[in-house]
Regions:
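N-terminal alpha-helical transmembrane segments of multi-pass membrane transport
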Residues: 1-73, 83-90, 101, 394, ...
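Extracellular loop-to-transmembrane helix junctions
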Residues: 9-42, 84-122, 143, 305-313, ...
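Membrane-interface loop-to-helix entry segments
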Residues: 20-27, 31, 35-44, 165-172, ...
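Extracellular/periplasmic helix-exit of transmembrane alpha-helices
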Residues: 29, 108-116, 120, 222-238, ...
Length: 440
């Protein structure tokens, strides 16, 4: 079964999807005139401006909800796995995917506001399934349904539950004697309390926890890097050289081809920042704003924070400490990097980070999956989705690590495909709206 899933994963994240994913970002970057560089200062400025418009939560809360789902195990374990399998060069391709992904995320945020609607309870509803249907017309309904089905699968079987819970249980088991079953049970109880509270409950947790945990984690990685500051030039050089040339086996590292570096860097980058996946615009649609371009700019900062800052710091921490060439993998690899500076406190410190990161990711993805489920079946059966989601959180503590990440990659690909098609079809709308806004 595992070998079959690996074959499907290799096909799903083969050249066609990678080209479509990065190609969409490159195309939007060119058509928008390097907007992710030239308008980045304004984007950060907009985050803290008072919101004026229709919506359910503030733009800052919407961004934090999106970051809650992106700043998760992908930043700690995903980066470690990418480097372990694809070599240091995977970090470079993660940067490239994030840079062009910022333009993709901008387009997603813009379209989320332009084509949002309201559900049967009066709450704002938006995201790819809505901009496919409202922006592209009824004939594209099958594509909207495909996205929504994939979104539910990702939430229940991928990023939303299994990868996060598995990472939490493994990390806690590595640092304590608590069994995965007990951890998963306790976690499912806390998740149930939060998810049955709805979006505002999730946003409240996100706006409180996300900024704090991100700042503390950044300080932790900077401390490790500072103690290895002399190795930075050589590490950066290794990242660039191994991005374009095969890397031989060394120690516990099995070696990596350029294709492996690209595939793992891009796939793990998407897993972490979700640019092109179509999840972030579901949160963006709830923002209290009537200006699509401004929400697009705010959404764009999520990819910058998640990958170009947090993932980069994780990658450098693993590389400068030299643990990447050992026998460890996953969370144990990053824990080992932290322990080189923080001694036996390192694994415990990272476990705290991981639990907070993963918990908020679970909450964010519950909301995404819920909106996709609602699009398919209406608000009447949301309670059923929430019950199944909590059960999947519980089950996540019993699934093998390798299978967890492979399943997550496969369902990610299913979700990204319809969204990327929609972004390309609706790109003229994005370009017209952008020009109209900046020509005011």
């Amino acid at each position: 079964m595992l070998e079959l899933l690996k074959s499907i994963d290799a096909f799903a994240w083969g050249p066609p999807l990678l080209i479509l994913l990065v190609g969409t970002g490159i195309y939007l970057t060119m058509r928008l005139g390097l907007l992710q560089v030239l308008r980045l200062p304004k984007a950060f400025q907009l985050i803290f401006i008072q919101d004026k418009g229709h919506g359910d939560v503030s733009s800052f809360a919407a961004l934090c909800t999106a970051l809650a789902s992106t700043v998760g195990t992908g930043n700690i374990i995903g980066v470690a796995t990418a480097i372990k399998v694809g070599g240091p060069g995977a970090l470079f391709w993660m940067w490239m995917a994030a840079f062009f992904g910022m333009a993709t995320k901008y387009a997603e945020g813009l379209l989320a506001i332009k084509y949002r609607t309201k559900d049967d309870h009066g709450a704002v509803a938006g995201g790819p399934m809505h901009y496919i249907l409202l922006g592209m017309g009824e004939k594209w309904l099958p594509l909207a349904v495909l996205f929504a089905v994939a979104g539910v699968l990702v939430a229940l079987l991928g990023i939303g539950t299994f990868t996060q819970v598995n990472s939490i249980t493994e990390s806690i088991q590595n640092t304590t004697t608590i069994s995965p079953a007990i951890t998963a049970l306790v976690l499912s109880v806390f998740v149930a309390i939060a998810v049955f509270g709805g979006l505002k409950s999730i946003s409240k947790v996100s706006t409180t926890v996300v900024p704090f945990m991100a700042l503390i984690y950044i300080l932790g990685t900077l401390t490790v890097i500072f103690f290895n500051i002399g190795k930075i030039p050589g590490t950066i050089a290794l990242v660039f050289t191994s991005a374009f040339s095969p890397l031989a086996a060394v120690g516990g590292f099995a070696g990596a081809s350029v294709r492996m570096a690209i595939q793992n860097g891009v796939a793990r980058g998407v897993f972490s920042n979700e640019s092109g996946l179509g999840s972030a615009p579901i949160a963006a649609a709830a923002a209290k704003t009537n200006e699509p371009v401004e929400q697009g700019l705010i959404s764009m900062t999520g990819t910058f924070i998640d990958t170009l800052i947090i993932c980069t710091l994780t990658g450098l921490t693993i590389l400068v400490t030299g643990v990447w060439s050992g026998d460890l993998n996953g969370v144990a690899l990053t824990q080992s990097a932290f322990s080189t500076v923080f001694s036996h406190f390192g694994p415990a410190l990272l476990t705290i980070f991981l639990v907070l990161f993963a918990f908020t990711t679970i909450l964010g993805w519950n909301y995404y999956g819920e909106r996709c489920f609602e699009f398919l079946f209406g608000v009447r059966f949301i309670w059923l989705y929430r019950v199944v989601f909590v059960l999947m959180v519980l089950l996540g503590g019993f699934i093998e690590l390798d299978m967890v990440w492979i399943i997550a990659d496969i369902v990610n690909a299913l979700m990204a495909l319809p969204n990327l098609i929609a972004l390309l079809v609706l790109s003229p709308v994005v370009i017209v709206e952008t020009k109209k806004y900046f020509n005011k």
